[in-house]
Amino acid sequence: MSKSENLYAQAQQLIPGGVNSPVRAFNGVGGVPLFIERANGAYLYDADGKAYIDYVGSWGPMVLGHNHPAIRNAVIDAAERGLSFGAPTEMEVKMAALVTELVPTMDMVRMVNSGTEATMSAIRLARGFTHRDKIIKFEGCYHGHADCLLVKAGSGALTLGQPNSPGVPADFAKHTLTCTYNDLASVRAAFEQYPQEIACIIVEPVAGNMNCVPPLPDFLPGLRALCDEFDALLIIDEVMTGFRVALAGAQAHYGVEPDLTCLGKIIGGGMPVGAFGGRREVMEALAPGGPVYQAGTLSGNPIAMAAGFACLTEVAQPGTHATLTELTNQLADGLLAAAKAENIPLVVNHVGGMFGLFFTDAASVTRYADVIRCDVERFKRFFHLMLAEGVYLAPSAFEAGFMSLAHGQAEIQHTIDAARRSFAKL
């Protein structure tokens, strides 16, 4: 029995499902999850000492690679001054200044502890600001595990086959209207049915929780126009795409200005951090200055702020996103060529530093219905073949992959060669 197998057996007796977040359990691919001992650069090292080229990146935060010295040193330095104060710090102000500088649509920002907290709080704020109850989200998109958002969710909810989670009261879910991603007609129909009741749209600008599905050219601008027409707020959930697709996020890449933006993952450099922010007049409705309540004991934690500030400072260096995009392009092109050489039908979607693999005969994958028609069983086999080759992909056909600046030509070439051998065995 490997150490991972032994640890998993112990964990299953102590932790529900043996993991602290469902997708880690390998339910989407079968087998025993890897238990990780350490990570550095582009590599993970499991409890048995085996190294893997990592394309999960802690589900997105590790854009600089694992254990980056600037972030590590910032955390050590901050920890020497104390772990948590429950009071404001200078680093919170510096972090807020940096975030609002890098993301120009954010006049003000509030720090929280996770992406779920960010989206949950942004929706509460939108409802409070507009005095409306209903929200629009999109089929296959995931915005955290708040009750109002677990309605036809993506991510682990798709992997588990439970797009509507038990425990979500029908009275909560009835205020969440689910539309089709990349389909403006479905959104207009929702607004026309409830013209004075919809507080906001929340959208992943690149749907990264049904693998990786970029927006069609007119989709995000169309959402902006509909929100303006019906006096609703547009919330762009950049928890995954923020600082990864472009420095100012996917909203800058696609040229769309939201009313509110949600951030997470990269903003913490590997520490638990989320944030939401946007137009000043909307943000000023938050407590303590306004009536919409939001709070958190560990929000703005000094260790997390130090890690995030160090990470964003590095990410903001010139050329970062051009390099990240070029590395992702090389990987995508290589995987497509390898699949074609072995007559394996494959679609690779990619934008910035994220990508998705779809085993399908379709010419493109642009919405949830396309995603669920892909060959999940073939992905499962491919995942384990690649794992045996020392390449760690997301353990679910419904999760995006992530490139980091620590990935070099050697890692990309190894991945492409491993894929060619794996495709040959499918």
UniProtKB/Swiss-Prot annotation:
Record-level Gene Ontology MF annotations: glutamate-1-semialdehyde 2,1-aminomutase activity; pyridoxal phosphate binding; transaminase activity
Cofactor(s) the protein requires to work: pyridoxal 5'-phosphate
Chief site of localization: cytoplasm
Cellular compartments annotated: Cytoplasm
GO CC list: cytoplasm
EC number: 5.4.3.8
Any Gene Ontology biological process: protoporphyrinogen IX biosynthetic process
N6-(pyridoxal phosphate)lysine PTM sites in chain numbering: K265
Family (UniProt): Belongs to the class-III pyridoxal-phosphate-dependent aminotransferase family. HemL subfamily.
Quaternary context: Homodimer.
Name listed for the protein in its UniProt record: Glutamate-1-semialdehyde 2,1-aminomutase
Source organism of this protein record: Erwinia tasmaniensis (strain DSM 17950 / CFBP 7177 / CIP 109463 / NCPPB 4357 / Et1/99)
